[in-house]
Amino acid sequence: MRSEPAMRRVVITGMGMLTPLGCGVEATWTRLLKGESGAKKIDTFDVSDIACKIACVIPRGDGAGATYNPDQWMEPKEQRKVDEFITFAMCAARQALDDAGWHPKT
């Protein structure tokens, strides 16, 4: 007879988000509650031969106004070594750690 693994409790102590609605939990949540959409017309590359002309993209900028600036979350030298989604994960993870107030020394 197989025994079931013991259930472990998980506690969420911090949150972080990077979404098409903005960088950060507060910005995303506020815009979501206002009924805003992250879907926008694609204007960063030519879509004339693509059927879909809209997408949900991460809002880029200097980091002000809930825009995403990867340099705030990872050194440019390190960014060149990884796929872009890794910088997204680092952004959300750092926000969650800051929200939790957890800043390990090592």
Annotate each predicted stretch with a short phrase.
Residues 1-106:
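Conserved "HGTGT" condensation-loop signature of ketosynthase/thiolase-family condensing enzymes
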